[in-house]
Curated annotation (Swiss-Prot):
Belongs to the UbiA prenyltransferase family. The gene is ubiA. This is 4-hydroxybenzoate octaprenyltransferase. Coiled coil: none annotated. One of its GO terms (biological process) is ubiquinone biosynthetic process. Catalyzes the prenylation of para-hydroxybenzoate (PHB) with an all-trans polyprenyl group. Mediates the second step in the final reaction sequence of ubiquinone-8 (UQ-8) biosynthesis, which is the condensation of the polyisoprenoid side chain with PHB, generating the first membrane-bound Q intermediate 3-octaprenyl-4-hydroxybenzoate. GO terms for molecular function: 4-hydroxybenzoate polyprenyltransferase activity. It is a multi-pass membrane protein. InterPro entries: HB_polyprenyltransferase-like, Prenyltransferase, UbiA_prenyltransferase, UbiA_sf. It is found in: Cell inner membrane.
Length: 296
């Protein structure tokens, strides 16, 4: 249904599908992975009753900024994507979209996102510049460092402090526990993603934590996930979250255990499935937060 709706945009313009693929709107997994921790922060910052305005601003902001990040990512990778089996048919790599068109779409999406942020307050507006900087820098990091996933984690977590300042204008120290938790979680699941392309990346000189971790990859990922849960547990104690929240964390831990077990053969398909599976972990934690506030 969702994909059919997107494909129907071709009736409006013959190249619409190319830009849908460029912004990765046809693959919403990235939206989910960014949305759940952001909504967790929105809910906690709003003490379980966030304003509808803030929910809409951050939900739409997630969709727009994730799309913007995909545009600039493909722009940065346009000369290497053609050498990787999974990415060879992307719009920029295949020549269906021009580099300047990708940059223009990136700017448009960032501009619309900024209009949303203007509906909050000055502190949140200033923080939003950090979000743009991280989104722009991340795609280029894989050329220079084995830690591009850390930069992605910082970018994917930036909505958390923004959610708190948007709710009350102040940023409590405990909010950074949520930030660190999400950064660690992001590094973990994006390492699974990088493991899919590891052989190709080694050939073309692209760096990643999957290459850095080597044979210890799954153990390190599980360690990062457990550390993330530890930070979430501490944050929950600081924000007086109880049983339902802890149940959500326990369910997420079960997801992480399944990912560790399912990737024991290190084949591409299982690593990609493990990456996708993190959507459920994020959703379960969010449900735990919502229920914990709603059932008090």
């Amino acid at each position: 249904m969702y994909l059919q709706l997107l494909k129907s945009l071709n009736r409006l313009h013959p190249r619409a599908w190319d830009f849908v693929q460029l912004s990765r709107m046809d693959r919403p997994i990235g939206i989910y992975l960014l949305l759940w921790p952001t909504l967790v922060a929105v809910w906690i910052a709003g003490n379980g009753s966030p304003s509808l305005k803030n929910v809409l601003i951050f939900a739409l902001g997630v969709v727009l900024m994730r799309a913007a990040g995909c545009c600039i990512n493909d722009f940065a990778d346009r000369k290497v994507d053609g050498h990787v089996k999974r990415t060879a048919d992307r719009p920029l790599a295949s020549g269906r979209v021009k580099p300047r068109e990708a940059v223009m779409l990136f700017a448009l999406l960032v501009g619309v996102s900024f209009l949303l942020v203007l509906c909050t307050n000055a502190t949140t507006v200033w923080l939003s510049f950090g979000a743009v900087a991280l989104a722009f820098c991340y795609p280029f990091m894989k050329r220079y460092t084995y830690y591009p996933q850390v930069v992605l984690g910082a970018a994917y977590s930036w909505g958390i402090p923004m959610a708190f300042t948007a709710a009350g204008g102040e940023l409590p120290a405990s909010a950074w526990l949520l930030y660190i938790a999400n950064l660690l979680w992001t590094v973990g699941y994006d390492t699974y993603y990088a493991m899919v392309d590891r052989d190709d990346d080694l050939k073309i000189g692209v760096k990643s934590t999957a290459i850095l971790f080597g044979e210890a990859d799954r153990v390190i990922i599980l360690t990062l996930q457990l550390l993330s849960l530890g930070c979430l547990l501490l944050a929950g104690n600081r924000f007086d979250l109880g049983g339902w929240y802890h149940l959500g964390l326990l369910a997420a831990a079960a997801c992480f255990a399944w990912e560790f077990w399912s990737t024991r053969k290190l084949d591409r398909e299982s690593c990609f499935k493990a990456f996708l599976h993190n959507h459920w972990a994020g959703m379960l934690i969010f449900i735990g937060v919502v229920l914990d506030y709603a059932l008090r």
